[in-house]
Design a protein with these regions (language model features):
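All-alpha prenyltransferase/terpene-synthase fold signal
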Residues: 1-299
Length: 299
């Protein structure tokens, strides 16, 4: 079935609008949910509240909320119309991203995230003991806080008020996404991306899986999207996810810094993603938003 939403012509959404509309529904959900969980942790032990406090600190430091945006527009592309229905799922994906960032900073030994100290660094700074014990405390605490963010993401996704069959299907897709992220992260750590095909494969798993395709699919599933719509979103998401990772490599380290990391490759992937949105199975407003999100990546 083709959808049409006349109040939102395809040219109406800028890149910022495509990000800000989902952000407006996700931020209150995240804050309310995490404040409530911090109070629950404080009831266990006041010191345990700091676990959730660190998650809130990292969220408050910034971030584009790109994964909630793709979840939201996947929902809209699949025919969903009620923002409240998708708000918790979209917020859950930002919590999952927070988990990934905390653990990624540990693996990469990154001292800062979003302009503030990484979680393991912040915890170590607060420890009164010798440097070696402080470092161990920081790393151990960051693992636990990352794990907690993942658990809270599960809880929030499960709270989505949708028919049970859609929620079960979304949870299965969510599990698949998490497995792909773990595989991609491990391959990245193992240093297997030594040629262009390998680099694109790692990018598809590590970045595309949970940045673009996974969130789009979860949103579309919760909307009850058709198989045709799901296929169209996949055809868009896969090259776009690869473009995300390669663009970061070009910006951070220059062209040729990683296999396939060139502006021309990024543009080619973005052209493929854009062309995949030409079918009749997606809501035009969502198509406009997705085109804007992809177009903003051009170098």
């Amino acid at each position: 079935m083709a959808y049409w939403v006349p109040m939102y012509p395809e040219t109406a959404l800028s890149h910022l609008q495509a990000l800000e509309r989902p952000r407006a529904i996700v931020e209150p959900v995240l804050e309310g949910f995490l404040v409530a969980r911090m109070e629950e942790m404080a009831a266990i032990d006041r010191r345990a509240a700091a676990l959730v406090g660190e998650i809130l600190r990292l969220l408050a430091a910034g971030g584009k909320r790109i994964r909630p945006a793709f979840c939201y527009w996947g929902y809209r592309a699949g025919g969903g119309t009620e923002d409240a229905t998708i708000a918790k799922a979209a917020a859950a994906l930002e919590l999952f991203h927070t988990f990934a960032l905390i653990h990624d900073d540990l693996m990469d030994e990154s001292d800062r995230r979003r302009g503030v100290p990484s979680v393991h660094v912040r915890l170590a700074e607060d420890h009164p003991g010798p440097a070696d014990r402080a470092e161990r405390y920081g790393r151990s605490g960051a693992i636990l806080i990352g794990d907690l963010a993942a658990v809270l993401a599960d809880e929030l996704l499960l709270a989505s008020e949708v028919p049970a069959d859609r929620l079960l299907a979304a949870l299965r897709r969510y599990d698949q996404m998490r497995i792909e992220v773990a595989a991609g992260q491990f391959l990245d750590v193992a240093g297997v991306a030594r040629d262009e095909p390998s680099a694109l494969r790692v990018a598809a798993l590590k970045t595309g899986a949970y940045t673009v395709e996974g969130p789009l699919h979860i949103g579309a599933i919760l909307a009850g999207a058709s198989l045709e719509a799901m296929a169209g979103l996949s055809a868009y998401a896969r090259p776009l996810g690869e473009a995300f990772q390669l663009r970061d490599d070009v910006l951070d380290h220059g062209e040729g810094s990683a296999p396939g990391a060139t502006a021309a490759t990024v543009d080619e992937l973005l052209d493929r993603a854009d062309a995949a949105l030409d079918g009749p199975h997606l809501v035009p407003e969502a198509v406009a938003a997705l085109r804007s999100l992809g177009g903003a990546l051009r170098l």
